[in-house]
Curated annotation (Swiss-Prot):
Record's protein name: Esterase FrsA
Entry EC no(s): 3.1.1.1
Note, other: Increased expression results in an increased fermentation rate on sugars with the concomitant accumulation of mixed-acid fermentation products.
Stated role: Catalyzes the hydrolysis of esters. Displays esterase activity toward pNP-butyrate. May stimulate mixed-acid fermentation by acting as a fermentation/respiration switch that down-regulates respiration and up-regulates fermentation rates.
Mutant phenotype after disruption: Deletion of the gene increases cell respiration rate on several sugars including glucose.
Length: 414
C-alpha cells in the first residue's frame, strides 16, 4: 500500500472519534497560572495543548508553518468540545488539531515522493514525520486519530532513514511477560561497534522526535543513538507505565551485548523530563552496564510529590500523566497518591550514593523541574555535575546546553 493510500485509509472522514481533551476525565481544578518552560513550551489562552514552539522548531519546523496551522485551527467555525478552546474541534475535519497538522504533513509527504534527490527527499520525509507527531501530540491513550497519525509518522521516519546519512536499523527487543518492543538504532558513518547513547524521552514525545539530537550532537562525534518509546505510547503502547519506570529500558540495556553494532562496554543513558526518571533508575539498578547518565529538566521527585508544584502544572500535562498511568477517570487526589510512588526519593533511590557519573541540566524557575531535583541527582552521584542553562536567548542556550552535555557524555564514552 502506498503512503498516500495509507493516509486515505487511516483518515476516513468520520466525526465520531473522541476529541483529545475529553479522553482524561479528571476533576478540573479551575483557572491555572500561565506556564512557560523551555522543554514544554507555554500555556496560551484558549488552547488546551501547550504550544511547544522551541522543540518543534528544534526538530526542523519553520515558525511560520506553526503559525499557519494554528491560524487554520483558530479560524474554524466547526463544533468544539469547549467553545473557549480553539484546539477542541470535534471530528476529523477542518479546524481539528490532528486534521490540520496531518494535512500539513501530507504536503511534505507529497514533496518527498516527487523529489528525485535522495537526501532532499529524506529531509522532506523527516519533516512529514515530525508534523505527524505534532498532530498526535500529546499522545493520549485511546486517541484513535492520534494513533493513526503516529503510524504515519513511523512510516515516514522509516522512509527518511533510508535516505539520510548514516544507517538506521529498526530493532525488536523481547520483554518477558508481555509484547516485544521496537526501537531505532541510529549509527554514524564508519565501522562499528559504536559507543551508544540510550535515549529516554519525555512522556509527551515519541522516540522519532529525537533525530535532531542524534544528527547535530551525537553523530558528528561518532556516537550512535538508540531510542525506544516510553511505556503506553507508540511501539511500547501495550506496556503501562508503572513505578518500575525503567523496566523496558533495562531489558534493552541487557540485550545490547547481542547487538553487533553497539559497543556494550561504552553505553550512556540520556533522559529528557520524565525520561530522566528512567535514566536515573538505570544509574542505580544497572550501574555496571552504564558509563554515564545525563538528564535535562528531570522529573524525579518534586512534581511527583509536591501538591503545590502539581497545582502549577497545566491541565494537559496532568492529563498526560494520568493517561500514562492508566488513570483516565481518577480523581486528582487518587492521581496525586499514585504519582508520589514514582518519586525516586520516595522509592529510596535518590539520596543514596550512586557509583554512576550523573549530570543534570536545569533552568531556573522551571515549573516542572526545580533546581533541587537536579541537585539531588548530582549530589547522589560519586561523579556528579550540575549544569544551569540560562533561559534567554532560549534556542541558543538550549543548543549550548546540549553541546555541553554531549561533551560530558563523550569524555565518559570515548
Amino acid at each position: 500500500m502506498t503512503q498516500a493510500n495509507l493516509s486515505e485509509t487511516l483518515f476516513k472522514p468520520r466525526f465520531k472519534h473522541p476529541e483529545t481533551s475529553t479522553l482524561v476525565r479528571r476533576f478540573n481544578h479551575g483557572a491555572q497560572p500561565p506556564v512557560q518552560s523551555a522543554l514544554d513550551g507555554k500555556t496560551i489562552p484558549h488552547w488546551y495543548r501547550m504550544i511547544n514552539r522551541l522543540m518543534w522548531i528544534w526538530r526542523g519546523i519553520d515558525p511560520r508553518e506553526i503559525l499557519d496551522v494554528q491560524a487554520r485551527i483558530v479560524m474554524s467555525d466547526a463544533e468544539r468540545t469547549d467553545d473557549d478552546l480553539y484546539d477542541t474541534v470535534i471530528g476529523y475535519r477542518g479546524g481539528n488539531w490532528i486534521y490540520e497538522w496531518a494535512t500539513q504533513a501530507m504536503v511534505w509527504q507529497q514533496k518527498a515522493c516527487a523529489e528525485d534527490d535522495p537526501q532532499l527527499s529524506g529531509r522532506h520525509w523527516l519533516h512529514a514525520a515530525t508534523l505527524y507527531n505534532i498532530a498526535a501530540y500529546p499522545h493520549l491513550k485511546g486517541d484513535d486519530l492520534a494513533e493513526q497519525a503516529q503510524a504515519l509518522s513511523n512510516r515516514a521516519y522509516e522512509e527518511a532513514a533510508q535516505r539520510l546519512p548514516g544507517t538506521m536499523r529498526q530493532m525488536e527487543f523481547t520483554v518477558p511477560g508481555g509484547a516485544p518492543i521496537t526501537g531505532f538504532l541510529h549509527m554514524p558513518k564508519g565501522d562499528g561497534p559504536f559507543p551508544t547513547v540510550l535515549m529516554c524521552g519525555g512522556l509527551d514525545a515519541m522516540q522519532t522526535d529525537y533525530y535532531s539530537l542524534y544528527e547535530r550532537y551525537f553523530a558528528p562525534r561518532g556516537i550512535a543513538m538508540l531510542t525506544i518509546d516510553m511505556p503506553s505510547v507508540g511501539f511500547s503502547s501495550k506496556w503501562k507505565l508503572t513505578q518500575d519506570s525503567s523496566l523496558l529500558h533495562q531489558h534493552v540495556l541487557k540485550a545490547l551485548p547481542n547487538v553487533p553494532w553497539v559497543d556494550h562496554t561504552r553505553v550512556a543513558a540520556f533522559g529528557f523530563r520524565f525520561g530522566a526518571n528512567v535514566a536515573v533508575r538505570l544509574a542505580y539498578l544497572e550501574s555496571p552496564r552504564l558509563k554515564a547518565v545525563a538528564c535535562l529538566g528531570p522529573v524525579v521527585h518534586t512534581l511527583l510529590s509536591d501538591f503545590k508544584c502539581q497545582q502549577q502544572v497545566p491541565e494537559m500535562y496532568l492529563d498526560v500523566l494520568a493517561s500514562r498511568l492508566g488513570m483516565h477517570d481518577a480523581s486528582d487526589e487518587a492521581l496525586r497518591v499514585e504519582l508520589n510512588r514514582y518519586s525516586l526519593k520516595v522509592q529510596g533511590l535518590l539520596g543514596r550514593r550512586c557509583p554512576t557519573p550523573m549530570l543534570s541540566g536545569y533552568w531556573k524557575n522551571d515549573p516542572f523541574s526545580p533546581e533541587e531535583d537536579s541537585r539531588l541527582i548530582t549530589s547522589s552521584s560519586a561523579d556528579g555535575k550540575l549544569l544551569e542553562i540560562p533561559f534567554n536567548p532560549v534556542y541558543r542556550n538550549f543548543d549550548k546546553g546540549l553541546q555541553e552535555i554531549t561533551d560530558w557524555i563523550e569524555k565518559r564514552l570515548c
